[in-house]
């Protein structure tokens, strides 16, 4: 899901043709990694334990 949102944001940034819009892409990546995905991973590790940790080793974060 996050990858699709990033692709939409990238397409919009290219369509705008504004170099300042790239700042939005960078901020999106930083915020999603730090605040959304990290919290989800912490929750999933507490809920599923080793099973989720093994899954994380096989699957990339941004899928």
Swiss-Prot record:
It comes from the Bacteria. Residues 1-21 form the signal peptide. Keywords: Signal. This is Uncharacterized protein HI_0149. It comes from Haemophilus influenzae (strain ATCC 51907 / DSM 11121 / KW20 / Rd).
